Amino acid sequence: MPDRLQLSPARLPPTPGPCSLWHMVQRLKYSYGADPSQWGELFLPDPPAAGQLRGVVVVIHGGYWRSTYGAELGEPLAVDLAEHGMAAWNLEYRRAGNGGGWPATFQDVLAGIDKLAELAGQHSLDLGKVVAVGHSAGGHLAVWAAGRGHLAGPGPGAELADPGGVRLAGVVSQSGVLNLAEAERLNLSNGAVANLLGGSSSEFPRRYRCADPMAALPLDVPVYAVHAEADDDVPLAMSALYVDASGAGGVPAHLVMVPGDHFDLINPKSPAYAVCRELAARLLG
């Protein structure tokens, strides 16, 4: 059985309190490519003490990889994280319907994370403490990006490999789609996986192997697979199957059950989201 944790905010160490004034959070938008969807917005709390560096949380929004949804879903999370003393990078990327899909969506996520290397000096970012919080399809992309080291070599995804890229130190997946084979079998969101990858697994087996976080196990970084108990959009199996498979070597993932539904996970006022925030803070150390 998967390693299940029942957590509530009361059982986790508190993060720093929010800034006394919301406008003290600095917002800076940067492009990492020429496409209108290739950008991120950096949310910064008060500067660290002189000579000190701070980690950063990459926020990756969901929407079943479709262009109908964008980074506006991640913005409230990025604001909240910054108000609680954490730098946050709200990442936009090309999706199916606006130039994304295979391989553009995956290229953008890696390039967007790598943009932090360019920004690190200016904003005192610690590239050894870059973690991700991803919701739904964004959870898939976050956990997939954590396994980028598996892309090197002659296997699937070698064209996406970059040995010099920024590596994630951990992930909080919020009801993430972490098993693409099962998601395809269940035909989640009317064929969202096939829409992302340009066809079925029988047509493009190599793409599916590259894109599936299951194929990158074992990972050498921690993953908290947070799942809402009343989630009707992404089945619990998406998290549970991944966590169960993670136990064979590497760093075991943890299944964290929280109250609420799919969208409570991205509501900064909900207890479900509060658990996600605390786990992100835990990963940053």
Which role fits each region the language model picked out?
Residues R4-G51:
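N-terminal cap/lid segment of alpha/beta-hydrolase-fold proteins
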Residues D114-L186:
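Primarily recognizes the serine-hydrolase "nucleophile elbow" in alpha/beta-hydrolase
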